[in-house]
Each structure stands twice: as structure tokens, then as C-alpha cells.
UniProtKB/Swiss-Prot annotation:
Record-given protein name: Phosphomethylpyrimidine synthase
Keyword GTP-binding: no
Lineage: Bacteria, Pseudomonadati, Pseudomonadota, Alphaproteobacteria, Acetobacterales
Role, per record: Catalyzes the synthesis of the hydroxymethylpyrimidine phosphate (HMP-P) moiety of thiamine from aminoimidazole ribotide (AIR) in a radical S-adenosyl-L-methionine (SAM)-dependent reaction.
Catalysed reactions, as listed in the record: 5-amino-1-(5-phospho-beta-D-ribosyl)imidazole + S-adenosyl-L-methionine = 4-amino-2-methyl-5-(phosphooxymethyl)pyrimidine + CO + 5'-deoxyadenosine + formate + L-methionine + 3 H(+)
Gene: thiC
Amino acid sequence: MNASIPAITTGPLPASSKVHVQGTLHDIKVPMRQIEISDECPLNVYDSSGPYTDTAISIDIAKGLADSRGIWLRSRGDVEEYDGRTITAVDNGFAEGERLTPAFPNQRRPLRAVGDRAVTQMAYARAGIITPEMEFVAIRENIGRTQALKEERDGEDFGASIPDFVTPEFVRQEIASGRAIIPANINHRELEPMIIGRNFLVKINANIGNSAVTSSMEEEVEKMVWSIRWGADTVMDLSTGRNIHNIRDWIIRNAPVPIGTVPLYQALEKVGGIAEDLTWEIFRDTLIEQAEQGVDYFTIHAGVRLHMIPLTARRVTGIVSRGGSIMAKWCLHHHRESFLYEHFEEICDICRRYDVSFSLGDGLRPGSIADANDAAQFAELETLGELTKIAWAKDCQVMIEGPGHVPMHKIKTNMDKQLEHCHEAPFYTLGPLTTDIAPGYDHITSAIGAAMIGWFGTAMLCYVTPKEHLGLPDRNDVKTGVITYKLAAHAADLAKGHPGAQMRDDALSRARFEFRWEDQFNLGLDPDTARAMHDETLPKQAHKVSHFCSMCGPKFCSMKISHDIRAAAEKQDGMEQMAEKFREGGQLYVPVTEPAE
């Protein structure tokens, strides 16, 4: 493989620049995207794109991003550097020679907790400590809220406790209670912290990853950068096949967002893909390997219990989770509970030393709407609630994964049961897909369900691309999935009544009514596509100031007609006001004329 540095997408989005807000409790600078608008003040929006859209920063992925958190971590006095485990051929799927992806060149010694301490954000929050990470996310969540204080709250939040203004203390309380998490491994020092919780903005995750048959390090790093450019808040690396360790290292060292994994996938590669040969020792070693690299959250399918597996026998689509099917096969072969369930407390002990958050996997999620809300799904959910309490007792951060395929009328039940059984831990759902009849369009079938469940209280939505059920998504699929899910998340924020959420909508609506085409493009989630579509029929620069588009033309544009009506009404109103003055004066108004010279 060519070890040269791959080309990475950089540069700001149209009419945009990076601005920073200074912290008050800690020496931090929180990045935001500022969009210039003609004849209006600039609009600041939440920005997860990291330094890649900052013209003041030079990107070299062979060096990785800046170590922005190192000083925060060391100042707490509870971490230590150590040599870490030795990387072996098995960690990269026995890739060798030209097939071996080069190791990331700028290696650091990993950090871990001193002694038996917990270095998690939950542990600090419970101790009453407001960390830099907590203040960082509070500032991010407050974008637009100061202006929104002037407006009346509008929305239905289904019992959430969304504040008018997010303070660092509010963040601390939410973390301490388990209602929110900040995925922030102490070895992911390049991270720009973000928060996942019901009382905060709805977040989205993008999945990337190579497979045994396709993709490379270059593609995966670019897919990560590409996905956060368009708004992904976290990225999951679901790589299988060769080079898993090295590809993951390149991704994390260049990722400003949290990175999640399913460690079971790599553990399975280490035993040649034979599920029955998996052991606790192999899995434990894989957890430590990934924790040392800086993985921020692990999907752990510990809720798949032996007695639940027969409940899936009558399903239309059986067990569709890769992790769930692997553990079900292991349990049946050994006729015992999974090592994930039996050793869950030991998994917690590993996670608390690095602050790796749990994403408790829904291994028995429904893979078709026919299987939605069945006994297997909800039996596992109850177990996930039990595991949540065990993790919380160890000061570990937890979120709960959810379905899947669920028709619209059954979605609310999923949210209600999750809140009940999992004690308000953040919910993280894949969609859900609301119908099964649209291969190639499952980004749409799932966005319908995602918007609904986000409104009901889900904290993070895992994107679905047009390639779902069909193949590995490419760069364009990733963008389509991210944009679609940003729409769903934003729609949920609006419906919940998040203060400030509507400011961007209103700014774009004003631009639309005033025929400010460039502002319309730039304020949208995807300026490039909006501009390209307009250019298809009206490509000239003069068309960018026209008071019509190709849909209606100049004579039938409803907004142009509205302008004419408004102008006529204002003229008529002016005449009426003048007539009223005449009536009040009781005489006609006679203008004064200058005397003739």
C-alpha cells in the first residue's frame, strides 16, 4: 500500500467561517460555524466539523489533530502514562507486506487511571466537579439561546426538562444522574467534547468502516472527515477484515468527534471468524487494545441472554444484529450465558479506567416491522436496564441502543419502555425504519421514524444510508445519510421546543421570501446541492437575484405576487391613514404653495 498522505476534504462551507467562544470557568475555546447573511447579522450554528473547515489550521493527517485535551487530563492528577500492550499481527487480521496498512506514525504512550480510580465524566460529576468538557458542551448547546429568550417557547417535550439556558452546572447534574453522557476517552486527546442526552440537542451518528472485500485507510479517514463536514456528531468505525487496528488508529488520531466501535467484530477476526471460538480473554484484550487507542464508546451486546434466544424463533427476520447473532450462536453452542453478561462488571472496570462509555447493544432488535415490539426485543431491553445500574455503580457512562424496524404507531411505546426500564439513560436508535418496502430509499423510511422517536426523547440517531441492506456505503451515500438525519434531528429539536432551534429556519424563510438565493443556499444543510439544482435551469449569475425560480416562472411566483399584494396593501393603508387624518381635522388638506416671484 502507498504510504503517502491521502487527500482530505478541507475548507469552509460557502459563506462560512470558524469562530470561537471563550470559556469562563476554564481556558477553553469552543468552535462554531458562522454563516454570513446579506442585510442581516451573521448566524452562528453548531459545528462538528473540527479543524477541517478552519482556514487558520493546516491539516496533516500523518501528524493527527492537536492534543487539545492533554492539559485538562493531566491537571486532574489522576492519570498516568504507561507502555501499553504490544501490537501483534492478529490485531490487524494477519495483514502483512503490501496488504498491511502503515501504522499511524505519530504514536503516543497511552493514559490510564492511577490505581483503581474512575476517571469518567460521571465520577467527576458525582463529586461535584465541573470539568472543561462539561463547560465546553454547555457553550455548544447554548448557540442561539440568548436571542431565543425573547421568544415564547413552542413545542411538546413529553416530560423532558429542557432549560432556557444550559449552564455547566446543569450539564454536571445531567451527567451525574445518568441522563446524559459525554463520550470522551482519556486517550482521545484530539476530541472536541459533545453531549448526548434527552434534554440536549438531538445528535446523529454516522457509521463507516472497511470490510473484508472493500475499502481502505484512505477512504475511511476521508469518510470520517466527510461525515463530520455535513454534521455527524459521532462516528462509529465498524471495520471488519484486515488492518482493523491500524485503520482505527488513523481515524481516531484525526477525529474531533467521539469514535465508537463494536469490539466484538475485531475479537471475532482474531479467532478466524468462528463465533464459537470466542473467549473472554480474547475479548478483554481487545477492549484494552481499543481503550488505549482512544475509542470513546463501545457497543456491548451483553443483553443477549440464553433464555431469550428461543423467543426469536417465530420472527420473520430472526436476529439481524451482527453482534447479537454472534453472541446468540456462542450461547447456543456453549449452552451458557455469554461472557459479555457474565463478565460485565469486569468490562466496567476496564471502561472506568479510560472513560469509555457504554452503548449497550440491542442484539435482539427487530429487523422487520413484523417483528417490532415483540417479547424478545423487550426482554433484552429489561436486561439492558439491569446492566445500566451495574455500570452506574462503577461510575461508567451509559447509553442504550434501540431499534430498528418499527411502524409509526408502535414507536412511542419504544421510547416509553426505554425510559421506564433503563432509568432515563440516553436512548440511541437506528432509525427506526417505518416500512420495509423501499430498498434503496431506507434513508427516507428510517428518517420518518427517526424524527418521531427523536421528538419523543431519543438522544442520538444512528444514520441509515440509501445502501442499507444493499451494500457498503460510499462517500456520496455517507453524505446523503448524514444530511437526511440532520433533517430528522433538527425536526425533532423544533418539535421539542429547543430554544433557538428555529432561528436558522426563520433566517432561511426570510431569504426565500426576499429572493436572496445565495443566502438560501448558504443557510441550508447542503448548500452545494441546493445551488446545483438551481443552476440546472437558471445557471446565470443574474438568476441569483431574480424574483422567481423555474418552478413557477416570473408571472406565477406566489411570493412575488405576495410582495405585490403587500405593497398594494401598504399603499392602501397609507391612503386610509391620510383619509383618517382628514376626517379628524374636519377639513380638506390644502397644500401650501410658494408665492410667485
